[in-house]
Amino acid sequence: MSAPEPKITPELIASHGLKPDEYQRILDLIGREPTFTELGIFSAMWNEHCSYKSSRIHLKGLPTKAPWVLQGPGENAGVIDIGDNQAVVFKMESHNHPSYIEPYQGATTGVGGILRDVFTMGARPIACLNALSFGDPSHPKTRHLVSGVVAGVGGYGNSFGVPTVGGQTRFHTRYDGNILVNAMAVGLADADKIFLAAASGVGMPIVYLGSKTGRDGMGGATMASAEFDEGSDEKRPTVQVGDPFAEKLLLEACLEIMAKDCVIAIQDMGAAGLTCSAVEMGAKGDLGVELDLDAVPTRETGMTAYEMMLSESQERMLMVLKPEKEKEAEEIFKKWGLDFAIVGYTTPTKRFVVKHGGQVKADLPIKELGDEAPLYDRPWVESPKLPVIHARDINAPMGAAEALEKLLATPDLCSKRWVWEQYDHVIGGNTVQRPGGDAAVVRIEDGPKGLALTVDVTPRYCEADPFEGGKQAVAEAYRNITAVGGKPLAITDNLNFGNPERPEIMGQLVGCLKGISEACIALDSPIVSGNVSLYNETSGRGILPTPSIGGVGVLDDFTKSATLAFKAEGEAILLIGETKGWLGQSVYLREICGREEGAPPPVDLAVEKRHGDVVRGMIHAGTATAVHDVSDGGLLVAIAEMAIAGNIGASLDAPPGETVSHAWWFGEDQARYVVTVKEADLLAVKTKLKTIGVPCTQIGVTGGHALKIEGERTVDLKALRHAHEHWLPDYMGGKN
């Protein structure tokens, strides 16, 4: 006999994240008081994490279509066609709240979840990336969080057998109480063998696959839809526990069963577990679903229907199976040592029915749970415009050489080698360009093609001007893919914001989305998948708006990709793009001048596209020997990174006479690249760029073992490398 269910009270409703008007909507919808299990189901499906109820109305404006897009948003991952019947499947997703509470497990299950999203579509994962945002280094929890998250990301990816090839790591005090862990996975599939989540056919068996269900992860999706407070550590039991070795078995079993043509529809059990996967499959297929929880494999005794429906135990899948393939499918999963259980059937009723112990625990309309969940048009206000900071109004407290050394040893600009060396970035043998460059390059087996992969966003720009910040995030992803020789094709996004019930926060989201949309259209890079993470606040203090952009591009010949390292002495250093010396929101202004203010640099998308096409053409023609986009830290930081990577110095000319020196070296004007060319090609390159109207300035020549800046003191490369490489390991070792 099952234990009596709790009485539905206002306190119980509130603890499930449901507001009074939402509960009233439930009463109106079903005409009675919900059962405890039904309350849990509504809580899971109507929370922000699963329903996107605050953002969905604005997401509809994003460009999602192109001739090469095979599957846009709405499925487990996006899919693009890269020719030769090959498709790239990719998505980015957050695991922010769990990673703050339990950094190792939060990060591992974030990686595991995004990998499942990719191989659920029928793709074999070939690469992972991430975007990590931590609090101020001086905060007492930051070092612990960095250590746990990085170990978790590496621990899962390394054990599963997928290389982690790139990403971002940043620090800012606004992430003190709410770090961000955004994970991206990329896979390859046959373009004509993509598997979707929509069920079809009445009476089809619904099969539970993978690991057993436990009580870990209870209420995880609801936790991810709420602000933190001082008692957040008490939510540790809601963090899931991952097993990468079980996931590897699940991957191989799923790909084998797909190859045997057993699958009608398949969905991974991620947020809200069995509830979300079953509802989505039925709702997308315009069918009902009936589940018998007595058949669910469990690893704990006495689990209730509520617990089984809301558990977020990892490494699980739900599949609608072709009936005639039942025995064959079961044999495959048993071979891999995984659970295989028929737990229900599709029905024509459009109802979601859950049975346990011979009793009906839930009987709800499935469409209203799924794709017809509440939709809010929340009030929003536009972010106020900040004044433009003029370079001549900023006094330089030190020379360019000294400022460069200081900047290279700051948390955001220092080398992240300590992070990525903990990841196996070459497992599989297809990594062409490792972390540390503009974009990762991964070879596609059995051919010359490669993929260029990157993750980008500049949150301080997004806070200062959400529209320009949204544009810039897409533009930088475009530049980074271009800088390695890739043709940008599509984007996945991960929108991390604070409390959407505050109009100023909602305004940030709306502004960023408008900027992202405009940039995607101009740069011909549709958004094919994504994730929204709201309520990233602690005690009323929100994070910086952080719309992470994951970019994917293709190279026809991966052997012709470019890198940022200087290749030889005596090569001309060219700056492509115009420099006005934009210091507003720059790293220089913050770290050297102690000011975090002003309007961010504007983004001219037509110029971005024109300059990108030119640089890509130079790479393909073989005239560009090294390429690096200019972003955080400005021109001199970009040159220093190229010199350090190639172990070759440079002699640099003084800034043009009309330019303020520190603005020339450290301004963060957009649409710029540093390119090196051989002396023999220099005249032809400069002539061509002048003819087509693309700004090109020769700013120096490679050579030696130092940076020699006209009018400044010389800086030895060893000193620059020490500054660049030592800050993070020293910090993690407690030395600073």
Curated annotation (Swiss-Prot):
GO cellular component: cytoplasm
Residues binding substrate, per UniProt: S94, H95, N96, H97, R116, Q240, E312, S313, Q314, S533
Keywords: ATP-binding, Cytoplasm, Ligase, Magnesium, Metal-binding, Nucleotide-binding, Purine biosynthesis
Gene giving rise to this polypeptide: purL
Function: Part of the phosphoribosylformylglycinamidine synthase complex involved in the purines biosynthetic pathway. Catalyzes the ATP-dependent conversion of formylglycinamide ribonucleotide (FGAR) and glutamine to yield formylglycinamidine ribonucleotide (FGAM) and glutamate. The FGAM synthase complex is composed of three subunits. PurQ produces an ammonia molecule by converting glutamine to glutamate. PurL transfers the ammonia molecule to FGAR to form FGAM in an ATP-dependent manner.
Binding site for ATP: Y52, K91, D493, G530
UniProt pathway annotation: Purine metabolism; IMP biosynthesis via de novo pathway; 5-amino-1-(5-phospho-D-ribosyl)imidazole from N(2)-formyl-N(1)-(5-phospho-D-ribosyl)glycinamide: step 1/2
Catalytic activity of the protein: N(2)-formyl-N(1)-(5-phospho-beta-D-ribosyl)glycinamide + L-glutamine + ATP + H2O = 2-formamido-N(1)-(5-O-phospho-beta-D-ribosyl)acetamidine + L-glutamate + ADP + phosphate + H(+)
Classification via HAMAP family: PurL_2
The protein's name: Phosphoribosylformylglycinamidine synthase subunit PurL
Naturally occurring in which organism (per UniProt): Rhodopseudomonas palustris (strain TIE-1)
SUPFAM superfamilies listed in its UniProt record: PurM C-terminal domain-like (SSF56042), PurM N-terminal domain-like (SSF55326)
Localisation per UniProt entry: Cytoplasm
Residues reported in the UniProt entry to bind Mg(2+) 2: D117, D268
EC number(s) per entry: 6.3.5.3
Lineage, broadest ranks: Bacteria, Pseudomonadati, Pseudomonadota, Alphaproteobacteria, Hyphomicrobiales
GO molecular function annotations of the record: ATP binding; magnesium ion binding; phosphoribosylformylglycinamidine synthase activity
